[in-house]
Design a protein with these regions (language model features):
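Copper-binding active sites and cupredoxin-like electron-transfer domains
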Residues: 1-245
């Protein structure tokens, strides 16, 4: 993986939870010199595990991660057992930000008072629906690189199995049924279920102040609506509102 630094500041990339040589771990000043502006660094390793993983800056983390330098990686097993097969495979990155009134850039100095909570860099109603057919077997991969908050992710209308953590896929005997799964900061969780009921079903964090930030309240059901329409309507009330991302 070639990483070219187009920032005005040094950076690195850390491959979170991945088994790799020490020199490829991406911690600036410890396992490698930071990548200077304009430079390219090659990260190289042999993939020895499958699962859901994340990557993020590991240099001036408070600033660079708070500005969105993060993402997800999925390593599929070379030989997939039957129980691994799904019809729909989704990935959602959970994050949080501080956006002051009248601004469009997150405040990287905030430590606890976050007011925008996002799923894959968007907050409701700018989030994309997870579309599936009745009877589909669905996997949702959840990763949390929020600065300070865990998220208890709840699915309406169905129960699911927790099938994997950032330590890898769980043996069938260790998987458990749930309707809500806690995704701690720096962790991943895979959940799997059968789409057994028709309809638009919410998927949200169940911490109430997180729910109020992005899910459902006082608005029509916008699971499959065009993002621009509700955004314009909300701006009539809150002039500085924007669907993040």
């Amino acid at each position: 993986i070639y990483v070219t630094n187009n920032l005005i500041a040094p950076t690195t990339v850390h491959w979170h939870g991945v088994f790799l040589p020490n020199g490829m771990d991406g911690v600036g000043g410890l396992t490698q010199p930071a990548i200077k502006p304009g430079q390219t660094f090659k990260y190289e390793w042999t993939v020895r595990q499958s699962g859901t993983f994340m990557y993020h800056s590991h240099h001036d983390e408070m600033t660079q991660m708070a500005m969105g330098m993060m993402g997800m990686m999925i390593f599929h097993p070379r030989h997939q057992p039957p129980e691994y097969q799904v019809d729909r495979d989704f990935a959602i990155m959970l994050s949080e930000w501080r956006l002051d009134p009248g601004t469009f850039r997150p405040n990287p100095n905030e430590m606890k008072d976050f007011n925008v909570l996002t799923m894959t860099a968007r907050c409701f109603p700018g989030t994309d629906p997870l579309v599936a057919k009745l009877g589909d077997r669905i996997r949702i991969r959840l990763g949390n690189l929020s600065a300070m908050d865990h998220h208890s992710i709840h699915l309406h209308g169905h129960y699911f199995k927790v099938t994997a953590t950032n330590g890898g896929r769980l043996p069938v005997s260790a998987q458990w049924l749930e309707t809500t799964v806690l995704v701690p900061v720096g962790s991943t969780r895979d959940i799997e279920f059968i789409a057994s009921e028709n309809g638009d079903w919410p998927l949200h964090c169940h911490m109430t102040h997180h729910v109020m930030n992005q899910i459902l309240h006082n608005f029509r059901n916008v699971i499959v609506i065009k993002k621009a329409t509700p955004a314009d309507q909300i701006r009539a009330i809150l002039p500085y509102y924007m669907p993040f991302g």
